[in-house]
């Protein structure tokens, strides 16, 4: 009976145990009195209750399987017909070992072959990288104000130059081909974004006031002494700083690209011919005439012009670096002498004390994108404030263009008033507080609440101070195969700056006009204390190179934008960003569409030639005083969406060009 009871218990085990006994017939027979290893089971359950469940934990399953008593005879096996157990006389370990041995031999051969192949491919790739011809597998794009400089930027990229190398060469080229807009005697700002690292830096090389410059001196004599308008040029220091940070080719080689343009000659652009024709004879020095009007008359578009003087200067800078410009050499002495001869107060010490600034751009999130722009004394915060205000309106394709234009006009009135309160934060700590307010979404909502949807405000919502910026500026926009984006805007302020030119051919800027002082303008606008004249200070600036990237992640739309036209450039950038990011228009259409700009001093709403009479009538019905002009500003751009890149110039510019590397 005891034997029958035991058999009955074993049959019950075979019938109700969840164990598949075909999987344990090769296990060795265990002594019946072997104690159960209960402690390890408890430890595993303590670690993870779910994995400790015998139905789910493979370790627990195997341990419980070892506790089952296996039949000891064939008769016992036969007495359990319902059991799935089968007797085996093979040595389970020897059979398994032989089978594993075979499998291991085959696996070893396969793994060895794969490793050998992979090693060979890796060695070949490394040798190709180090000894093969260099190759570029991605696209690139260049946009500048002159076709010759755009092609030069492409040339630098094709010779394995970095995006910043291309930007430096193209910017120096514009100082040669478009001397009315930019040059070695001016300054600017460059915004660089590294897509792979998702990092951005801004190089600020805006001109600074000479140490001996005083407000009362400017107020009394600025119209008769052009030398007073000359600030310490930052162009050479800024471009060299950018190259030190991001350059790939040697500095001398980058400058040699631009020097070749000056030496070999270039075709006079339509814009340069127009600017020279508009220069009044009394404003031209004899040296200026010899340089730009060798025949005694303004050159025609397309005529060939050589600048061997600038080629020589660039050769010197390529060999000696910025020290040749700032450290008291011949170039420094010439610039100081030229400015002082025309009533200026700039000194050699001002040049030696100058430094370019490397800082972070200001940023704001707009429609799922991060907009990056220069901080004060530049007006990037006002640009972001305009976008923050517009973001709260229901601007979709279903909203009429006329209604959208009204909202844009009222928003820009606020943004430009905010811009007039900015200046150099090094000299006024309240500017940082003003900047923070401009970047605030809460503040934007408050300002938006003061905009009437159907009627123009009869007077500015905020106090407006004197607004006057450089009307001419040169733009360079690069999206390189190295996954860098570069946006740069530079200027001499007025066309040809101060009109003063050194014996070496360097035109000097007139950037001190961007400061504010009493009774400077004909309409007697209130001067801005934040932008008052002080030694070493940098004046308010509307140079706004702007980069847009996805707010999250690396995939999506990137933009590089620039504009000229001073305050009108801020208005233009705002409307282009609105068209691309809110209304989902392509970049070409966004740049071509008509733009407006509220002139706060005259209380006129200026619109360009692209506006229809119906649109003008609608705006006038809303209370706007509309003035139609030919062109407000040029806004160029480049766009990258994933791996597709396009370069687009503003169609209003007769000379600008965009080119894409395929």
UniProtKB/Swiss-Prot annotation:
Q: Which residues cross the membrane?
A: 107-127
Instruction: Spell out the protein name for this chain.
Output: Glutathione hydrolase 7
Residue intervals annotated with topology Extracellular: 128-662
User: Which cellular component appears as one GO term in the record?
Assistant: plasma membrane
- Sites carrying a glycan are 198, 267, 283, 330, 353, 394, 452, 519, 523, 586
Tell me what organism the protein belongs to.
Answer: Homo sapiens
Question: Which Enzyme Commission number(s) are on file for it?
Answer: 3.4.19.13, 2.3.2.2
Q: What is the lineage of its organism?
A: Eukaryota, Metazoa, Chordata, Craniata, Vertebrata
| Family to which this protein belongs | Belongs to the gamma-glutamyltransferase family.
């Amino acid at each position: 009976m005891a034997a029958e009871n035991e058999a009955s218990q074993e049959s019950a085990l075979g019938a109700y145990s969840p164990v598949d006994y075909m999987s344990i017939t090769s296990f060795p027979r265990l002594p019946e009195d072997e104690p159960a290893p209960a402690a390890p089971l408890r430890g595993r359950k303590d670690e993870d209750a779910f994995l400790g469940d015998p139905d789910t934990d493979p370790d627990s399953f195997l341990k419980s399987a070892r506790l089952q008593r296996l039949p000891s005879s064939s008769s016992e096996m036969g007495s359990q017909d319902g059991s799935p157990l089968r007797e085996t006389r093979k040595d389970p370990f020897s059979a398994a070992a032989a089978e594993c041995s075979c499998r291991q031999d085959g696996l070893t051969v396969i793994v060895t072959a794969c490793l050998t192949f992979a090693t060979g491919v890796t060695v070949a790739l490394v040798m190709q990288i180090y000894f093969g011809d260099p190759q570029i597998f991605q696209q690139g794009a260049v946009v500048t104000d002159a076709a010759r400089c755009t092609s030069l930027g492409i040339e630098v990229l094709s010779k394995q130059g970095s995006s910043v190398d291309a930007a430096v060469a193209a910017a120096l080229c514009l100082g040669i081909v478009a001397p009315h807009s930019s040059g070695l005697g001016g300054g600017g700002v460059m915004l660089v974004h590294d897509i792979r690292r998702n990092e951005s830096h801004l190089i600020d090389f805006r001109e600074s006031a000479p140490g001996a410059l005083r407000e009362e001196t400017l107020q009394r004599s600025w119209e008769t002494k052009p030398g007073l308008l000359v600030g310490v040029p930052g162009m050479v220091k800024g471009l060299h700083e950018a190259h030190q940070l991001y350059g790939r080719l040697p500095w001398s080689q980058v400058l040699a690209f631009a020097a070749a343009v000056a030496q070999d000659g270039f075709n006079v652009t339509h814009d340069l011919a127009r600017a020279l024709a508009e220069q009044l004879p009394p404003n031209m020095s004899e040296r200026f005439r010899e340089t730009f009007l060798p025949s005694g008359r303004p050159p025609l578009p397309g005529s060939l012009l050589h600048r061997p003087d600038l080629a020589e200067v660039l050769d010197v800078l390529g060999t000696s670096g910025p020290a040749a410009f700032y450290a008291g050499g011949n170039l420094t002495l010439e610039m100081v002498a030229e400015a002082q001869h025309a009533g200026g107060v700039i000194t050699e010490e001002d040049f030696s004390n100058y430094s370019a600034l490397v800082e972070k751009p200001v940023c704001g999130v707009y429609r799922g994108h991060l907009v990056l722009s220069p901080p004060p004394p530049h007006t990037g915060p006002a640009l972001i404030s305009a976008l923050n205000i517009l973001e709260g309106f229901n601007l979709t394709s279903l909203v009429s263009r006329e209604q959208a234009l009204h909202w844009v006009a009222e928003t820009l009135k606020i943004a430009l008033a905010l811009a007039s309160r900015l200046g150099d934060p090094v000299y006024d700590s309240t500017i940082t507080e003003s900047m923070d307010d401009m970047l605030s979404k809460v503040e934007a909502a408050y300002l938006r609440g003061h905009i009437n949807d159907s009627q123009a405000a009869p007077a500015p919502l905020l106090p407006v101070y004197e607004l006057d910026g450089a009307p001419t500026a040169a733009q360079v926009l690069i999206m390189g195969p190295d996954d860098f984006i570069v946006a740069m805007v530079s200027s001499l302020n007025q066309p040809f700056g101060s009109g003063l030119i050194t014996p070496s051919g360097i035109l000097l800027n007139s950037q001190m006009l961007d400061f504010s002082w009493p009774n400077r303008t004909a309409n007697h606008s209130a001067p801005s204390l934040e932008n008052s004249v002080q030694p070493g200070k940098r004046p308010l600036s509307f140079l706004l190179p702007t980069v847009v990237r996805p707010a999250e992640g690396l995939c999506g739309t990137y933009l590089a934008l620039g504009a000229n036209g001073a305050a009108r450039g801020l208005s233009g950038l705002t409307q282009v960003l609105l068209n691309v990011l809110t209304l989902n228009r392509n970049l070409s259409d966004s740049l071509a569409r008509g733009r407006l700009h509220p002139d706060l001093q005259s209380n006129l709403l200026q619109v360009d030639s692209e506006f229809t009479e119906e649109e003008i009538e609608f705006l006038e019905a809303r209370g706007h005083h509309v003035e139609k002009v030919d062109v407000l500003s040029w806004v160029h751009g480049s766009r990258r969406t994933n791996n597709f890149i396009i370069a687009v110039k503003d169609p209003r510019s007769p000379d600008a060009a965009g080119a894409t590397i395929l």
